[in-house]
Regions:
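Acidic/histidine-rich alpha-helical segments that form the ligand environment
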Residues: 27, 94-140, 148-152
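Short, contiguous alpha-helical
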Residues: 3, 45-101, 136-190, 195-197
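Phosphate-binding active sites in nucleotide-utilizing proteins
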Residues: 200-201
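Amphipathic, non-membrane alpha-helical segments in soluble helical-bundle scaffolds
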Residues: 21-28, 55-62, 85, 89, ...
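Alpha-helical packing segments of well-folded alpha/beta enzyme cores
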Residues: 24-27, 31-38, 65-68, 115, ...
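N-terminal regions that are enriched for targeting/export leaders
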Residues: 2-47
Length: 201
């Protein structure tokens, strides 16, 4: 079973994480919030653009990371969990063959529906379902397999945070107006020119 294999491969790392001072719920919220912070400078149109085959739309990244928690933790391990939209299992799978059929990677940029607002509601739906599960992990030792899957899910989302940045960097660079991501201040002075330094001996 795919979830069992994933859990076995990441159990050692999650055991260490469980000993850290930061609780599971706090870590989950921090990682998810950082994804939102990365996307904060974007406008709606930025979320859906795809400028080359190796780029995925930002909207797809933020949906896919929620799909992971839903597919490998909530659906099989939380009795009574109901997906917000069962069709998302097909749309936002990537290359997890054992998890079912998936939308063609090359056509991710064709998907304007669900909307960006729909995707944020999807993330909120998954977050609401994950909250009591993570709170229980903080209160008890919990299930080692679940801890391993949560750890993997957080690492997976952090990987996609990097992909969000690299993909949107190419997308913004491809635009004639050269928009910038965020309003970070520019350097107040130029760097000093490089030069050789001589030492005796």
């Amino acid at each position: 079973m795919v979830t069992a294999g994933i859990a076995r491969n990441t159990r050692a790392g999650s055991e260490q994480a469980a000993r850290d001072e930061t609780g599971w719920l706090e870590r989950y919220r921090a990682v998810r919030a950082f994804t939102h912070a990365l996307c904060a400078p974007l406008v709606t149109e930025d979320y859906v653009v795809r400028t080359m085959t190796d780029v995925s739309p930002t909207k797809w990244h933020i949906a896919h990371t929620s799909w992971f928690f839903e597919t490998f933790i909530l659906t099989p391990r939380v009795p009574g969990y109901q997906p917000l939209d069962a069709r998302y299992a097909y749309l936002f799978n990537s290359y997890y063959v054992q998890a079912g059929e998936r939308h063609c990677r090359a056509q991710r940029g064709f998907v304007t529906r669900p909307t960006v607002a729909d995707i944020y509601e999807y993330r909120a739906h998954v977050d609401r379902a994950m909250t009591p599960l993570l709170a229980r992990l903080d209160e008890t030792d919990g299930d080692a397999d679940v801890r391993a899957l949560v750890e993997l899910g957080l690492n997976h989302e952090q990987q996609h945070q990097e992909l969000i940045l690299t993909d949107i960097k190419h997308a913004l660079w491809s635009m004639p107006l050269r928009p910038e991501l965020g309003a970070s201040p520019r350097a107040v002075k130029n760097a000093e020119p490089l030069q050789w330094v001589e030492f005796e001996g």
